[in-house]
Amino acid sequence: MRVKHKPWAKDRLEEFPAIYIKNPEDFKGQWHEVFGNDNPIHIEIGSGKGQFISGMAKANPEINYIGIEMIESVLVSALDKAIEVDVPNLRLVARDAKLLEDCFEKGEIAQIYLNFSDPWPKKRHTKRRLTNPTFLTIYERLLPKAGEIHFKTDNRSLFEYSLVAFSEYNMLLTFVSLDLHNSDYEGNIKTEYEEKFSAKGFPIYRLEAKFDRN
């Protein structure tokens, strides 16, 4: 989907330094100082317009959340959501997922959310998928031993690819649903895409996984 360029987005984001972290590399290993506490940090990679990450931050004040979205013209919508919920445990960052190790120390992130990531269906684009082993290597470094990845998508092909990728990486699959909204899973917070696709009757696929470091 083509994103409409908003030339004013960068300036708008920088008007709210309490929410938008312009230079996240400056806080590598020091994110507890940003939040003013030692609560666990959860990140969403590809936050889109921010409905999920804002909802999570509001529902779980004992956890710190960082929404990461590389496109500033999209992240500015997440900023509006963050302003609306007005909670102290939410920050936003504009960075490519490939650069996360520049922003976070090893083991600094307790949990990672991947919601409705671009499926990159063409074979030559496989390495761009956020569940590709290249990215799993990055996530493994960011997460502590007990850290988890939570992944949701409406794309069955991407979900099947991800199941294989996680398994071949020797990850432990602790939860798998092929129809999340008709399962007994509680506490689900929907993304904008999730609402749209589920309203059309499409099943939502979800998994939870962690790295096997025994």
Curated annotation (Swiss-Prot):
InterPro entries: SAM-dependent_MTases_sf, tRNA_(Gua-N-7)_MeTrfase_Trmb, tRNA_methyltr_TrmB_bact. It is an enzyme of class 2 (transferase). S-adenosyl-L-methionine binds at residues 44, 69, 96, 118. The keyword Magnesium does not apply. Its EC number is 2.1.1.33. The keyword Transferase applies. One of its GO terms (molecular function) is tRNA (guanine(46)-N7)-methyltransferase activity. The active site is at 118. It comes from the Bacteria. Substrate binds at residues 122, 154, 191-194. It catalyses: guanosine(46) in tRNA + S-adenosyl-L-methionine = N(7)-methylguanosine(46) in tRNA + S-adenosyl-L-homocysteine. Catalyzes the formation of N(7)-methylguanine at position 46 (m7G46) in tRNA. Belongs to the class I-like SAM-binding methyltransferase superfamily. TrmB family. This is tRNA (guanine-N(7)-)-methyltransferase. It comes from Listeria monocytogenes serovar 1/2a (strain ATCC BAA-679 / EGD-e). The lineage of its organism: Bacteria, Bacillati, Bacillota, Bacilli, Bacillales.
